[in-house]
Regions:
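Single-stranded nucleic acid-binding surfaces, predominantly the OB-fold ssDNA-binding core
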Residues: 1-113
């Protein structure tokens, strides 16, 4: 079987201050929404932009750093992998979530800089 590559690299802004949360099995993590922006000019030369939102999860020491230092508007560089996980909602219905599991993060500053 061929070896695959699953790597995500993003640079963007944090939507809101992250908080520690727990999965149903008790595992703690931090989840944040990260915005990346694409800018271009249309055929008439008018500036256009689009914001893409990415769901990111961080575990362990990386989660602790995120909770302690990141705030709304913080700019970060992160690397991770795309993962889809199955979970059950409060009614017992199976759901799936696709997110980026970060394994490296560098703080770049805030949106105020």
């Amino acid at each position: 079987m061929a070896r695959g590559v699953n790597k995500v690299i993003l640079v963007g802004g944090v939507k809101a201050k992250p908080e520690i949360k727990n999965f149903q099995d008790g595992t703690s993590y931090t989840r944040l929404d990260l915005a990346t922006n694409k800018e271009w000019k249309d055929k008439e030369g008018k500036p256009q932009s689009k914001t893409e939102w990415h769901r990111v999860v961080l575990f362990g020491g990386l989660a602790d750093v995120a909770v302690r230092w990141l705030d709304s508007g913080s700019q970060i560089y992160l690397e991770g992998e795309l993962q889809t996980r199955k979970w059950q909602d409060k009614d017992g219905i199976d759901r799936w979530t696709t997110e980026i599991r970060a394994n490296e993060m560098t703080m770049l500053g805030s949106s105020k800089n």
